[in-house]
A protein has these predicted regions:
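C-type cytochrome heme-c attachment and multiheme electron-transfer modules
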Residues: 1-122, 131-388
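Active-site-proximal beta-alpha loop/turn segments in soluble metabolic enzymes
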Residues: 127
Length: 388
Protein backbone atom coordinates (compact mmCIF):
# COMPACT_ATOMS: atom_id res chain seq x y z
CA UNK A 1 0.00 0.00 0.00
CA UNK A 2 1.18 3.52 -0.79
CA UNK A 3 2.57 5.49 2.18
CA UNK A 4 0.77 8.59 3.35
CA UNK A 5 2.18 12.06 2.83
CA UNK A 6 3.75 13.47 6.03
CA UNK A 7 0.94 15.97 6.48
CA UNK A 8 -1.71 13.28 5.99
CA UNK A 9 -0.27 11.23 8.82
CA UNK A 10 -0.81 13.90 11.45
CA UNK A 11 -3.59 16.18 10.21
CA UNK A 12 -6.50 16.32 12.64
CA UNK A 13 -9.77 17.23 10.95
CA UNK A 14 -10.96 19.45 13.78
CA UNK A 15 -14.46 20.02 12.43
CA UNK A 16 -15.15 16.36 11.75
CA UNK A 17 -13.39 15.03 14.84
CA UNK A 18 -15.20 17.41 17.20
CA UNK A 19 -18.54 15.85 16.18
CA UNK A 20 -17.48 12.36 17.32
CA UNK A 21 -17.61 10.81 20.78
CA UNK A 22 -13.85 11.09 21.20
CA UNK A 23 -14.00 14.70 20.06
CA UNK A 24 -15.72 15.60 23.34
CA UNK A 25 -12.66 14.48 25.30
CA UNK A 26 -9.80 16.91 25.85
CA UNK A 27 -6.60 16.08 23.96
CA UNK A 28 -4.66 15.99 27.24
CA UNK A 29 -6.99 13.33 28.65
CA UNK A 30 -5.33 10.81 26.35
CA UNK A 31 -2.09 12.43 25.18
CA UNK A 32 -1.20 14.26 28.41
CA UNK A 33 1.15 17.19 27.76
CA UNK A 34 0.25 20.67 28.94
CA UNK A 35 -2.87 22.74 28.30
CA UNK A 36 -1.24 25.67 26.55
CA UNK A 37 -1.61 27.56 23.28
CA UNK A 38 2.17 27.60 22.93
CA UNK A 39 3.19 24.65 20.76
CA UNK A 40 6.43 23.80 22.53
CA UNK A 41 4.84 24.01 25.96
CA UNK A 42 1.76 22.03 24.90
CA UNK A 43 3.90 19.17 23.62
CA UNK A 44 6.06 18.79 26.72
CA UNK A 45 5.75 15.23 28.06
CA UNK A 46 3.12 14.47 25.43
CA UNK A 47 2.38 10.80 24.69
CA UNK A 48 2.17 10.48 20.90
CA UNK A 49 0.66 6.98 20.95
CA UNK A 50 -1.43 6.81 24.13
CA UNK A 51 -2.91 3.39 23.39
CA UNK A 52 0.64 2.02 23.66
CA UNK A 53 1.01 3.34 27.19
CA UNK A 54 1.12 0.85 30.03
CA UNK A 55 -1.50 2.95 31.79
CA UNK A 56 -3.99 1.68 29.23
CA UNK A 57 -5.81 4.93 28.54
CA UNK A 58 -8.32 3.21 26.23
CA UNK A 59 -9.36 0.79 28.94
CA UNK A 60 -10.41 3.60 31.27
CA UNK A 61 -13.58 3.80 29.16
CA UNK A 62 -13.54 0.43 27.37
CA UNK A 63 -13.44 -1.54 30.60
CA UNK A 64 -14.77 -4.74 29.01
CA UNK A 65 -11.44 -5.15 27.21
CA UNK A 66 -9.17 -4.33 30.14
CA UNK A 67 -7.08 -7.36 31.04
CA UNK A 68 -8.26 -9.17 27.91
CA UNK A 69 -6.76 -7.36 24.94
CA UNK A 70 -3.39 -7.15 26.71
CA UNK A 71 -3.20 -10.95 26.45
CA UNK A 72 -4.34 -11.13 22.82
CA UNK A 73 -1.98 -12.19 20.05
CA UNK A 74 -2.20 -8.72 18.51
CA UNK A 75 -0.85 -7.23 21.72
CA UNK A 76 1.67 -9.85 22.81
CA UNK A 77 2.91 -11.38 19.55
CA UNK A 78 3.13 -14.53 21.61
CA UNK A 79 3.38 -16.66 18.49
CA UNK A 80 6.88 -15.31 17.93
CA UNK A 81 7.95 -16.12 21.47
CA UNK A 82 6.40 -19.57 21.38
CA UNK A 83 8.60 -20.36 18.39
CA UNK A 84 11.71 -18.64 19.76
CA UNK A 85 11.46 -20.23 23.20
CA UNK A 86 10.80 -23.66 21.70
CA UNK A 87 13.73 -23.47 19.30
CA UNK A 88 16.04 -21.61 21.67
CA UNK A 89 17.41 -22.20 25.17
CA UNK A 90 17.03 -20.03 28.31
CA UNK A 91 20.61 -18.73 28.21
CA UNK A 92 19.96 -17.24 24.75
CA UNK A 93 16.74 -15.49 25.76
CA UNK A 94 18.26 -12.06 26.45
CA UNK A 95 19.97 -11.98 23.05
CA UNK A 96 16.81 -13.08 21.27
CA UNK A 97 14.85 -10.45 23.20
CA UNK A 98 17.16 -7.77 21.81
CA UNK A 99 16.70 -9.10 18.28
CA UNK A 100 12.95 -9.34 18.79
CA UNK A 101 12.78 -5.73 19.92
CA UNK A 102 14.74 -4.57 16.88
CA UNK A 103 12.99 -6.58 14.20
CA UNK A 104 9.78 -8.31 15.30
CA UNK A 105 8.01 -5.96 17.68
CA UNK A 106 6.83 -3.61 14.91
CA UNK A 107 4.07 -6.11 14.22
CA UNK A 108 2.64 -5.48 17.69
CA UNK A 109 -0.61 -3.55 17.57
CA UNK A 110 -2.36 -1.32 20.05
CA UNK A 111 -5.95 -0.07 19.93
CA UNK A 112 -4.95 2.98 17.90
CA UNK A 113 -3.15 0.91 15.28
CA UNK A 114 -6.49 -0.50 14.16
CA UNK A 115 -9.08 2.08 15.10
CA UNK A 116 -7.54 5.47 14.32
CA UNK A 117 -4.39 5.00 12.25
CA UNK A 118 -2.56 2.64 9.96
CA UNK A 119 -0.24 0.18 11.70
CA UNK A 120 3.26 1.36 12.55
CA UNK A 121 4.67 -1.48 10.45
CA UNK A 122 3.50 0.31 7.28
CA UNK A 123 4.45 3.80 8.36
CA UNK A 124 1.44 4.78 10.47
CA UNK A 125 -0.72 7.82 9.88
CA UNK A 126 -4.38 8.65 10.52
CA UNK A 127 -7.12 6.99 8.48
CA UNK A 128 -9.37 10.01 8.50
CA UNK A 129 -8.09 13.01 10.39
CA UNK A 130 -7.96 11.31 13.83
CA UNK A 131 -11.57 10.13 13.55
CA UNK A 132 -11.93 6.76 15.28
CA UNK A 133 -13.58 3.97 13.34
CA UNK A 134 -15.38 1.06 14.94
CA UNK A 135 -14.70 -1.25 11.98
CA UNK A 136 -11.27 -0.50 10.51
CA UNK A 137 -10.90 -0.31 6.71
CA UNK A 138 -9.69 -3.76 5.67
CA UNK A 139 -6.99 -2.76 3.19
CA UNK A 140 -5.53 -0.07 5.45
CA UNK A 141 -5.62 -2.10 8.63
CA UNK A 142 -5.92 -5.89 8.36
CA UNK A 143 -4.10 -6.48 5.08
CA UNK A 144 -1.63 -3.69 5.83
CA UNK A 145 -0.04 -6.21 8.19
CA UNK A 146 -1.40 -9.50 6.83
CA UNK A 147 -0.82 -8.57 3.22
CA UNK A 148 2.05 -10.45 1.65
CA UNK A 149 0.30 -13.80 1.98
CA UNK A 150 -3.27 -13.60 3.28
CA UNK A 151 -4.12 -10.22 1.78
CA UNK A 152 -2.80 -10.96 -1.69
CA UNK A 153 -4.50 -14.35 -1.75
CA UNK A 154 -7.83 -13.06 -0.51
CA UNK A 155 -7.97 -10.05 -2.82
CA UNK A 156 -6.75 -11.97 -5.88
CA UNK A 157 -3.46 -10.11 -6.25
CA UNK A 158 -1.39 -13.22 -6.98
CA UNK A 159 -1.04 -13.26 -10.75
CA UNK A 160 -2.97 -16.05 -12.39
CA UNK A 161 -5.06 -16.96 -9.36
CA UNK A 162 -8.53 -15.63 -8.48
CA UNK A 163 -9.37 -13.97 -5.22
CA UNK A 164 -11.18 -15.85 -2.49
CA UNK A 165 -14.79 -16.61 -3.40
CA UNK A 166 -15.95 -14.94 -0.18
CA UNK A 167 -14.44 -11.66 -1.37
CA UNK A 168 -15.03 -12.08 -5.09
CA UNK A 169 -18.69 -13.06 -4.83
CA UNK A 170 -19.67 -11.92 -1.36
CA UNK A 171 -17.45 -8.83 -0.90
CA UNK A 172 -16.86 -10.07 2.62
CA UNK A 173 -14.38 -8.23 4.83
CA UNK A 174 -12.06 -9.82 7.36
CA UNK A 175 -14.37 -8.96 10.25
CA UNK A 176 -17.25 -10.86 8.68
CA UNK A 177 -15.49 -14.03 9.84
CA UNK A 178 -12.99 -12.76 12.40
CA UNK A 179 -15.16 -11.09 15.03
CA UNK A 180 -14.15 -8.33 17.39
CA UNK A 181 -14.13 -10.88 20.20
CA UNK A 182 -11.52 -12.94 18.38
CA UNK A 183 -9.39 -9.95 17.39
CA UNK A 184 -9.47 -8.54 20.92
CA UNK A 185 -8.67 -11.91 22.48
CA UNK A 186 -12.08 -11.91 24.13
CA UNK A 187 -14.02 -15.21 24.12
CA UNK A 188 -17.66 -14.62 23.27
CA UNK A 189 -19.00 -17.94 24.51
CA UNK A 190 -17.85 -20.70 26.82
CA UNK A 191 -17.34 -23.25 24.06
CA UNK A 192 -14.65 -21.11 22.44
CA UNK A 193 -12.28 -22.04 25.25
CA UNK A 194 -13.91 -25.01 26.98
CA UNK A 195 -14.06 -27.35 24.02
CA UNK A 196 -13.29 -30.74 25.50
CA UNK A 197 -13.29 -32.39 28.92
CA UNK A 198 -9.49 -32.22 29.11
CA UNK A 199 -9.40 -28.54 28.15
CA UNK A 200 -10.88 -26.55 31.00
CA UNK A 201 -8.54 -23.57 31.26
CA UNK A 202 -8.51 -20.19 29.54
CA UNK A 203 -4.82 -19.37 29.24
CA UNK A 204 -3.66 -16.74 26.73
CA UNK A 205 -3.03 -18.34 23.32
CA UNK A 206 0.52 -19.41 22.52
CA UNK A 207 0.09 -18.92 18.78
CA UNK A 208 -2.68 -18.18 16.28
CA UNK A 209 -3.73 -21.81 15.91
CA UNK A 210 -3.73 -22.46 19.64
CA UNK A 211 -7.05 -23.33 21.22
CA UNK A 212 -10.39 -23.46 19.47
CA UNK A 213 -10.56 -23.19 15.69
CA UNK A 214 -12.44 -20.00 15.08
CA UNK A 215 -14.04 -19.24 12.78
CA UNK A 216 -14.80 -22.53 11.06
CA UNK A 217 -16.15 -23.13 7.58
CA UNK A 218 -18.91 -25.20 9.16
CA UNK A 219 -20.16 -22.13 11.01
CA UNK A 220 -21.72 -21.00 7.72
CA UNK A 221 -21.78 -24.36 5.93
CA UNK A 222 -23.20 -26.70 8.60
CA UNK A 223 -24.40 -29.31 6.13
CA UNK A 224 -20.84 -30.21 5.22
CA UNK A 225 -20.36 -31.47 8.76
CA UNK A 226 -23.65 -33.28 8.92
CA UNK A 227 -23.08 -34.98 5.57
CA UNK A 228 -26.47 -33.94 4.24
CA UNK A 229 -25.37 -31.74 1.34
CA UNK A 230 -25.40 -34.61 -1.19
CA UNK A 231 -21.72 -34.07 -2.02
CA UNK A 232 -20.23 -37.52 -1.90
CA UNK A 233 -16.69 -36.29 -1.30
CA UNK A 234 -17.71 -34.63 1.97
CA UNK A 235 -19.19 -37.91 3.18
CA UNK A 236 -16.26 -40.05 2.02
CA UNK A 237 -13.51 -37.93 3.55
CA UNK A 238 -15.34 -36.70 6.63
CA UNK A 239 -12.93 -35.10 9.08
CA UNK A 240 -9.80 -36.56 7.46
CA UNK A 241 -9.23 -33.44 5.34
CA UNK A 242 -9.25 -29.78 6.24
CA UNK A 243 -11.51 -27.78 3.93
CA UNK A 244 -8.49 -26.06 2.37
CA UNK A 245 -7.11 -29.37 1.05
CA UNK A 246 -9.86 -29.44 -1.57
CA UNK A 247 -10.96 -25.82 -1.78
CA UNK A 248 -7.72 -23.82 -1.78
CA UNK A 249 -5.63 -23.09 -4.84
CA UNK A 250 -1.95 -22.23 -5.18
CA UNK A 251 -0.69 -19.90 -2.45
CA UNK A 252 2.64 -18.34 -1.53
CA UNK A 253 5.46 -19.50 0.71
CA UNK A 254 8.79 -17.94 1.57
CA UNK A 255 12.04 -19.15 3.04
CA UNK A 256 14.56 -17.90 5.57
CA UNK A 257 14.32 -14.49 7.17
CA UNK A 258 17.65 -12.98 8.26
CA UNK A 259 18.04 -9.90 10.43
CA UNK A 260 20.86 -7.43 11.00
CA UNK A 261 21.63 -3.83 11.93
CA UNK A 262 22.99 -1.50 9.26
CA UNK A 263 26.56 -0.37 9.92
CA UNK A 264 25.88 2.83 7.99
CA UNK A 265 22.59 3.98 9.50
CA UNK A 266 22.50 1.97 12.71
CA UNK A 267 18.96 0.92 11.90
CA UNK A 268 17.77 -2.70 12.09
CA UNK A 269 16.56 -4.41 8.95
CA UNK A 270 15.54 -7.84 7.74
CA UNK A 271 15.66 -9.69 4.44
CA UNK A 272 13.80 -12.77 3.25
CA UNK A 273 14.41 -15.10 0.39
CA UNK A 274 12.13 -14.86 -2.63
CA UNK A 275 8.44 -15.67 -2.32
CA UNK A 276 7.28 -18.58 -4.44
CA UNK A 277 4.04 -20.34 -5.31
CA UNK A 278 3.14 -23.63 -3.65
CA UNK A 279 0.29 -25.97 -2.96
CA UNK A 280 1.29 -28.84 -0.71
CA UNK A 281 -0.71 -31.21 1.44
CA UNK A 282 0.93 -32.69 4.51
CA UNK A 283 0.17 -34.35 7.80
CA UNK A 284 -1.60 -32.09 10.27
CA UNK A 285 0.84 -30.79 12.92
CA UNK A 286 -2.01 -29.21 14.92
CA UNK A 287 -4.22 -32.27 15.19
CA UNK A 288 -6.60 -31.82 18.10
CA UNK A 289 -10.19 -32.05 19.25
CA UNK A 290 -11.16 -29.08 17.08
CA UNK A 291 -8.70 -29.80 14.23
CA UNK A 292 -9.09 -33.55 13.74
CA UNK A 293 -7.89 -33.64 10.15
CA UNK A 294 -5.23 -36.12 9.11
CA UNK A 295 -4.24 -34.00 6.11
CA UNK A 296 -4.05 -30.23 5.77
CA UNK A 297 -2.37 -27.59 3.63
CA UNK A 298 1.14 -26.54 4.67
CA UNK A 299 3.03 -23.31 4.04
CA UNK A 300 6.77 -22.75 4.39
CA UNK A 301 7.38 -20.09 7.02
CA UNK A 302 10.21 -17.53 6.73
CA UNK A 303 12.62 -18.88 9.29
CA UNK A 304 16.02 -20.52 9.30
CA UNK A 305 18.39 -21.89 11.92
CA UNK A 306 20.69 -18.91 11.32
CA UNK A 307 17.99 -16.19 11.14
CA UNK A 308 19.58 -14.35 14.10
CA UNK A 309 23.24 -15.10 13.34
CA UNK A 310 24.00 -11.35 13.34
CA UNK A 311 23.49 -11.44 17.10
CA UNK A 312 25.39 -14.64 17.83
CA UNK A 313 26.05 -18.20 16.80
CA UNK A 314 23.65 -21.09 17.34
CA UNK A 315 20.95 -19.02 19.03
CA UNK A 316 18.30 -21.56 18.00
CA UNK A 317 19.94 -24.90 18.91
CA UNK A 318 16.57 -26.68 18.99
CA UNK A 319 15.52 -25.43 15.57
CA UNK A 320 14.38 -28.89 14.45
CA UNK A 321 11.74 -29.15 17.18
CA UNK A 322 9.20 -27.24 15.06
CA UNK A 323 8.42 -27.79 11.36
CA UNK A 324 9.32 -25.16 8.79
CA UNK A 325 6.34 -26.35 6.74
CA UNK A 326 3.58 -25.19 9.04
CA UNK A 327 -0.19 -25.60 9.36
CA UNK A 328 -1.79 -23.15 6.95
CA UNK A 329 -5.23 -21.78 6.19
CA UNK A 330 -4.85 -20.12 2.76
CA UNK A 331 -7.42 -17.39 2.19
CA UNK A 332 -8.09 -18.17 -1.47
CA UNK A 333 -11.07 -20.53 -1.17
CA UNK A 334 -12.82 -21.61 -4.38
CA UNK A 335 -15.85 -23.82 -4.98
CA UNK A 336 -14.10 -25.63 -7.83
CA UNK A 337 -10.36 -26.27 -7.80
CA UNK A 338 -7.93 -28.61 -9.57
CA UNK A 339 -8.30 -30.99 -6.61
CA UNK A 340 -12.07 -31.28 -7.02
CA UNK A 341 -11.90 -32.26 -10.70
CA UNK A 342 -11.53 -35.97 -9.92
CA UNK A 343 -10.44 -38.36 -7.20
CA UNK A 344 -7.12 -38.95 -8.94
CA UNK A 345 -6.39 -35.24 -8.98
CA UNK A 346 -5.12 -36.01 -5.47
CA UNK A 347 -4.94 -39.81 -5.21
CA UNK A 348 -1.71 -40.96 -6.80
CA UNK A 349 -0.57 -37.38 -7.56
CA UNK A 350 2.86 -36.84 -5.95
CA UNK A 351 3.05 -33.19 -7.02
CA UNK A 352 0.67 -31.91 -4.36
CA UNK A 353 1.92 -33.80 -1.30
CA UNK A 354 4.85 -32.80 0.92
CA UNK A 355 7.18 -35.74 0.46
CA UNK A 356 10.78 -36.00 1.59
CA UNK A 357 12.16 -35.32 -1.88
CA UNK A 358 10.72 -31.78 -1.78
CA UNK A 359 12.73 -30.79 1.30
CA UNK A 360 16.16 -29.29 1.63
CA UNK A 361 18.38 -31.83 3.45
CA UNK A 362 18.79 -29.57 6.48
CA UNK A 363 15.00 -29.38 6.91
CA UNK A 364 14.16 -33.07 6.88
CA UNK A 365 14.39 -33.63 10.62
CA UNK A 366 12.35 -30.53 11.46
CA UNK A 367 9.52 -31.67 9.18
CA UNK A 368 9.49 -35.38 9.98
CA UNK A 369 6.04 -35.11 11.56
CA UNK A 370 4.39 -33.40 8.57
CA UNK A 371 6.00 -35.31 5.69
CA UNK A 372 3.60 -37.67 3.93
CA UNK A 373 5.44 -41.03 3.96
CA UNK A 374 3.21 -42.58 1.31
CA UNK A 375 0.71 -40.68 -0.79
CA UNK A 376 -2.82 -42.06 -1.22
CA UNK A 377 -2.88 -44.51 -4.11
CA UNK A 378 -4.81 -43.82 -7.28
CA UNK A 379 -8.29 -45.29 -7.44
CA UNK A 380 -9.33 -47.47 -10.36
CA UNK A 381 -12.94 -46.42 -10.48
CA UNK A 382 -13.20 -42.80 -9.35
CA UNK A 383 -16.36 -41.59 -7.71
CA UNK A 384 -18.35 -39.38 -10.06
CA UNK A 385 -17.02 -35.88 -10.57
CA UNK A 386 -18.34 -33.76 -7.65
CA UNK A 387 -18.30 -30.67 -9.88
CA UNK A 388 -20.82 -32.08 -12.33
Amino acid sequence: MAPLEPWEKVLVNAEKFSETVHGHIACTNCHEGAESSDKDTAHENMIARPSEAESGVCFECHTDLDGVFQNSLHATLQGYWTALDTRGVPENHATLEEAFGNHCSNCHTSCGDCHVSQPASVGGGFFDGHVFTNTPPMTRSCTACHGSRVGNEYLGKNEGFPGDVHFREGRMNCVDCHSDHELHGQPSECSQCHTAPEDVTMAPPEHRYDGVQLPTCESCHPNTTLGTDNIEMHTVHGADLSCQVCHSVTYTSCDGCHVAVSEKSGKPFFATDATYSTFLIGLNPQRSYTRPYKYTTLRHVPTAADSFSFYGENLLPNFDVLPTWAYATPHNIQTKTPQTESCNACHGNPDIFLTIDKLNPEEVNANKDVIVPQIPTAVEEPISNPNE
